[in-house]
Amino acid sequence: MTYYSKYSTPFGDVIIICNEKSLTGVYFYSSRYFPVEANNVSANDKCEIIAKTKKWFDIYFSGKCPDFDLPLGISGTDFQKKVWCIISQIPYGKTVTYGEIAARLSAQNGGKKVSCQAVGHAVGKNKISIIIPCHRVIGANGEMKGYAGGIEKKIKLLSLEKENSTEDN
């Protein structure tokens, strides 16, 4: 069974999607990949994963880095999963470039070249926004590049993290 619930962030509402075992999606309502079937859903706060996700968001949007993980149900290609794994390791308040991710993947693949565009495509297919922090991936020279929720939200998320980032976060 699939469960849906809405959560209001300071930057716009998101839809939280999960099943009995894991979180499977977080989308801003303005996202270009917003799942159409989630348009008219009612809250289902009885689902433990939704409750934990909302707690995670409460902590995050209060300016702190949540200190617990959520069970993630990630679906995608092997390449996408590798990219999302690297993204998940980007520390709170920090950013990396598409090129840095491509270089890391290349090193993991015995030096086989990985294009920044392929990385960008995989980043764009992330279904669990904010929690898999694709907003922390930027273009060369600090340029703000695509974000499914919109560049404005990406900038706000990064600003929130930078304003509240400490070595202990």
Please identify what each model-predicted range represents.
Residues 130-137:
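Short Lys/Arg-enriched helix C-cap and helix-to-coil transition segments
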Residues 14, 95, 122, 126, ...:
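Gly/Ser/Thr-rich beta-alpha loop segments that engage phosphate groups in nucleotides
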Residues 1-114, 160-169:
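Basic nucleic-acid-binding alpha-helical/helix-turn surface characteristic of O6-alkylguanine DNA
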Residues 140-169:
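…primarily DNA-binding HTH/wHTH and HhH modules…
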Residues 110-128:
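Regulatory, non-catalytic segments
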Residues 23, 128-130:
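Mobile beta-alpha loop/short-helix "lid" or hinge segments that flank ligand
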